[in-house]
């Protein structure tokens, strides 16, 4: 039924675009050009959709991928097989509106994963749970984005709004069996004001994320298994049969705002954005038990530039930086049982006895640089060459007694792509190296189960420098189905990461995939 619905969505999108689009068939080179020419591409401000000057176009595909190898962290698992359907489209709706839509459905299975039953085990809320027994996990995710923006109205004003909606399901297939479900939505209204070639934009958003584990079950009740509750770094409490009656909810409310400025003309356009967001995430168990509360503050900067030095060359320069501070207040609570004397019924609640402010702390810093030189011909990009660089710094701390985990790395990648539209062939290659600049682990108690089975083994991965490469080959061919002519494609791709020697052995991680789809 799901596949039938997906095919119906694809056919509808193709039909809409075919009726509105009279230009030549979309191909990979033209697709790259449409996504590269405007600095406002990828903006969180939906009011900027009309600034991107897009024709009606999109793509849809099915994808299968396999990931494996021995270069992985404990909570990631060693192998993953995944099936995906993806489609996105840009459309002009009537005279006054532009729209963007995206639908992404994927399902997969991960093997030999342990020590986490939630979707965010790293650098986030520390109050999660898991089993130390390796198991397979099945997951399904649905990601929807819908954005609409007006043309310029009322002497320079544009208006828009965007909705992001995500559903997730993560199920453990071995005792103790958990099922984590995710509902995440984000609403972002936005406006821009233009005067001459200058554009100023404002956007604000509300993001609600709820992940919950309703129950943890067992099939084999003859043996009790240890289930762990985590509190940050090595601090995890395991109890025999601890999964019995376990339930937990993580509910986050985030408010954010961004201010953007852009300059727009044919030869040069740019967009610069600064943003700030605050999140407040409650953690709730049975009878509203709260092990703690997690807060985040995020500050981000993005600047994108597009410059045409001639009719046949287009330069892209993208800069991005983000700094996140998170901390958790840890609670000590006591169960209070109250009996109604008239009915004999009991009511339950937890009263807070003690609060450890900012007991767990995390800071994240990311900086990214991307430059790409594009050759342009007939509104296509037949060739590009570029360089990407990134810096990442992570710091986790748990207080009283103090434990820390710190790591950082620098990644430099070269890229090159060719689109031969006359024969329908495209290829992309990337070669890079990620250098580990720091990895330290200092634990107050390194003898705990979580330290011995997760943190200490992970340090080999976090401290490893490695080379990585990516290769993509695509073949495109026009196909007519019921009078609708579209460019169909088949794409094969793969990437490989090889580490420096760890204990006299080089670890490897690979991904291979195959996609079949169409441009429209």
Residue ranges and their predicted role:
Residues 18-111, 125:
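N-terminal, post-signal peptide beta-strand-biased segments of exported outer-membrane/organellar beta-barrel
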Residues 70-75, 112-118, 170-178, 213-219, ...:
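Outer-membrane beta-barrel translocator domains and adjoining extracellular loop/strand segments
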Residues 62-68, 105-109, 152, 165-169, ...:
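Transmembrane beta-strands of outer-membrane beta-barrel pores
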Residues 237-387:
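Long, internal scaffold/assembly segments composed of regular secondary structure
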Residues 24, 508-520:
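Outer-membrane beta-barrel "beta-signal"
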